[in-house]
């Protein structure tokens, strides 16, 4: 890449970054937080944060990259995607009418809410316990990170339930919403994330998500400022780099350490070059249609229920890894959101996907606002826990693609909804047995005086 080519790419990158950052800043000033703000920051991180890192790798370490015209296509496709997404998100689908009291779809009380977070936490802890009994601490047993996807590791399906510890702790926080509950959320979820990091063998997702939710709650409540958020972001990047070194068993120093930091940070937070590799092989792609979305559900179907279930699922990430890159190392390489749309239907699917994503984020913000307006604090805690708990799925959406997001968000909704139903059933059983006694002001006063 020549300096002239780099200069042209830099101008496009700067314009796209300023365009997205400006719209995000205006939205932040208006509402402080919503899921449009979160997705916009996530989109910036995924498709634009990596450009400066790639530039340093090219000019400082002479690392090879895709041709400049391909990198230009990546930047332009990301900028156009966001423009279509933003217009879709801001488009009002129906006229605003005065709030009319409606019969709520469901209600929650104190016992049901506490039962819900206990069940969610129980699912996570039991799953971790069973996985640990089968495999021990994989971080200290395996020689390479790719081995966690091999047949040596049993009970891999249990990892999908680990994440429900975070929604459980979110319910606990939203029931109190003070600084102590906020700090308790951070300590408990990060400790759990470190435990799963050691047990699973290097998976950092739970730590990243817990830290991100902690920061966004702090921004919403005004407990941290923007400069503190930026400082925490830098600390998070350094922390993720250190965990990556431990995961891959690397011991580096000097120029090698700087080089390793650049490419690991780029691959962790901004896999934009993966989209460049995909576009570079555009003519070799056999468009998959909506099949990757259907196939991604296969992993949630037990083999005893479907004996003939394919052992290898050809979703967009695996198609990109196996068919496009001819990489059979055992690791699936993230195609990114735009890349998954290209695998499914080529360039035509990019604006269509942007419209779909705009509607998805609009729906989550509708739920979030519903929780903000809810007068029942227990129902509000459940709604907010569900919305913030889905942040992991939004990260999957930006990094892995639309197909991975759809299957995971459906799984999340089913499990979360099942926990709600079980909590309500248990409450009904306890109440029928006479074990539930409603609190009264007189009984509370007696307890205080006693």
UniProtKB/Swiss-Prot annotation:
Subcellular location: Cell inner membrane
Cellular component, GO annotation: plasma membrane
Disulfide bridge positions per record: none
Membrane topology of this protein: Multi-pass membrane protein
Job description of the protein: Probably involved in the polymerization of enterobacterial common antigen (ECA) trisaccharide repeat units.
Binding partners and assembly: Probably part of a complex composed of WzxE, WzyE and WzzE.
Protein name: Probable ECA polymerase
Species, as recorded: Shigella flexneri
């Amino acid at each position: 890449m020549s300096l002239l080519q780099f200069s042209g790419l830099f101008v496009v990158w700067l314009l796209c970054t300023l365009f997205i950052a400006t719209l995000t800043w205006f939205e932040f000033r208006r509402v402080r937080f919503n899921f449009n703000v979160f997705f916009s920051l996530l989109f910036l991180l995924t498709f634009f944060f990596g450009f400066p890192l790639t530039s340093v790798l090219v000019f400082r370490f002479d690392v090879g990259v895709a041709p400049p015209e391909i990198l230009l296509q990546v930047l332009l496709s990301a900028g156009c995607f966001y423009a279509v997404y933003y217009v879709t998100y801001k488009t009002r689908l129906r006229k605003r009418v005065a709030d009319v009291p409606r019969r709520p779809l469901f209600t929650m009380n104190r016992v049901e809410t506490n039962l819900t977070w206990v069940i969610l936490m129980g699912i996570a802890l039991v799953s971790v316990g069973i996985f640990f009994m089968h495999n021990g601490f994989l971080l200290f047993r395996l020689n390479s990170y790719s081995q966690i996807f091999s047949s040596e590791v049993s009970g891999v399906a249990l990892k999908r339930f680990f994440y429900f510890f975070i929604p459980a702790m979110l319910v606990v926080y939203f029931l109190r919403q003070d600084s102590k509950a906020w700090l308790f959320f951070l300590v408990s979820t990060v400790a759990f994330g470190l435990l799963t990091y050691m047990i699973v063998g290097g998976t950092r997702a739970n730590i990243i998500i817990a830290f991100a939710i902690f920061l966004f709650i702090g921004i919403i409540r005004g407990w941290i400022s923007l400069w503190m958020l930026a400082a925490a972001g830098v600390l998070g990047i350094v922390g993720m780099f250190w965990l990556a070194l431990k995961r891959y068993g690397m011991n580096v120093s000097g120029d090698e350490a700087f080089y390793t930091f650049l490419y690991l940070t780029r691959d962790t937070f901004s896999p934009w070059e993966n989209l460049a590799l995909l576009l570079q092989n555009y003519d070799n792609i056999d468009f998959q249609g909506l099949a990757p979305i259907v196939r991604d559900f296969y992993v949630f179907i037990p083999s005893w229920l479907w004996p003939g279930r394919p052992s290898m699922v050809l979703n967009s990430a695996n198609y990109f890894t196996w068919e496009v890159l001819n990489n059979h190392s055992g690791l699936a390489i993230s195609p990114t959101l735009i890349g998954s749309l290209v695998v499914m239907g080529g360039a035509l699917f990019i604006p269509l996907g942007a419209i779909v994503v705009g509607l998805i984020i609009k729906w989550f913000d509708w739920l979030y606002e519903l929780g903000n307006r809810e007068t029942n604090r227990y129902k509000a805690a459940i709604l907010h826990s569900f919305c913030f708990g889905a942040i992991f799925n939004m990260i999957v959406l930006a990094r892995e693609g639309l197909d991975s997001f759809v299957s995971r968000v459906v799984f999340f909704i089913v499990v979360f909804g099942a926990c709600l139903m079980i909590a309500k059933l248990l409450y009904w059983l306890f109440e029928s047995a006479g074990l539930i006694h409603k609190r009264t002001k007189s009984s509370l006063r007696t307890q205080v005086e006693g």
